[in-house]
């Protein structure tokens, strides 16, 4: 399996995103661009003021299946996985991020996300919207997990997360449901 690593790109908000694409053919500027926009939009919407670092792996169903099995003992592929570095509380993030900063980089390592582009393409077709919107939505979903949101219940937690996902997506050009 060939891997391509795109060196971390820093935005003006001091966000470093380390993207790894497992297939050279998937090194699409549009995918990188929407991931970056959605990471930035989520951090802004959630009021994160710390300089952050996020690792993103874009893989296929086989790759995410292996990660899902190894990390969660779930023997099937999924669309996105999130691995937060810290246990944060959704909607109640720290005002002072000093204790979370890596002393070497000066950045807050929020965690890792894995996206199955193969699954995103299938879901975009299934839901009748663009691949761009699906990858963006999965990125926002994963970022919210890194920031302490969860949807394990069918009640308020899930509703809160869904509401945040839709609000953030609506604020990004090209991310509307249509």
Question: Predicted segment positions?
Answer:
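An acidic/histidine-cluster motif and surrounding catalytic segment
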Residues: 2-136, 144-178
């Amino acid at each position: 399996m060939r891997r391509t690593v795109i060196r971390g790109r820093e935005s003006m908000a001091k966000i470093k995103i380390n993207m790894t694409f497992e297939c050279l053919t998937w090194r699409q500027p549009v995918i990188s661009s929407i991931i970056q926009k959605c990471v930035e939009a989520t951090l802004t919407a959630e009021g994160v003021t710390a300089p952050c670092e996020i690792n993103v792996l874009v893989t296929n169903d086989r790759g995410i299946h292996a990660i899902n099995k190894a990390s969660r003992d779930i023997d099937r592929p999924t669309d996105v996985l999130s691995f937060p570095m810290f246990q944060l509380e959704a909607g109640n993030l720290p005002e002072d991020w000093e204790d979370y900063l890596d002393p070497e980089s000066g950045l807050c390592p929020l965690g890792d996300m894995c996206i199955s582009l193969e699954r995103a393409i299938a879901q975009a077709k299934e839901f009748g919207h663009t691949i761009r919107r699906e990858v963006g939505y999965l990125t926002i979903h994963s970022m919210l997990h890194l920031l302490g949101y969860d949807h394990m219940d069918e009640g308020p937690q899930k509703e809160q997360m869904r509401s945040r996902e839709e609000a953030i997506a609506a604020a990004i050009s090209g991310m509307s449901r249509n």
